[in-house]
Amino acid sequence: LESRVKLPLAPKVGHAGKIRANQWKYVDYDGDGRLDLVVGIGDWTDYGWDNAYNARGEWTNGPLHGYVYLARNSGTNARPQYVSPVKLTAGGQAIDVFGWPSPNFADFDGDGDLDLICGEFLDRFSYFENVGSRMRPRYASARRLEHKQRPIAMNLQMIVPAAIDWDKDGDIDLVVGDEDGRVALIEHTGRTRDGLPRFQPPRYFQQQAADMKFGALATPCGF
């Protein structure tokens, strides 16, 4: 923090249009010991705004997009050099959730490589299993996190998950902020079934008498 160093990357990675999420974080994506950059972009260019219904109630604009980009570090952690960002894929197609992707890379299924969980502009979660390896990640198509055969959902929208072993039991939980500033724990059960890690439904953190609140659009960070 002694001096500012300008990154050789565009502020809006891969996009010149309207965005409402621009989420940067470090991760050693390919296990080479160097911290790469991943960027979640919420692209509203096709979607526009919420007034595009016609008289028949049909949506006339395009979809809302949520992409994940990787900028590999070809240098060192002390002197990083980032190559041009590329859009990550899963199941042979670009990862594209419903805006606000908030990407989290962690070993959610306990097999030694980094899987991916994304949030979205609405209230649910997408899981992308790493079916490659730690050094050569390859992601399967998205699956919804679920509990008792129903999708896990937050109470509100614009959710921001942060992966952390909250209870120090050896598996990776999620601490999630939502639109009104509340924060919830989604606890990993330690089990994986049918290739999908199993989580408990959200439990909102509380103060002595009410929900713990941090204003609007809470963005928790675990470390």
Task: Map each language-model feature to its residues.
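Beta-propeller-forming repeat regions
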Residues: 1-223
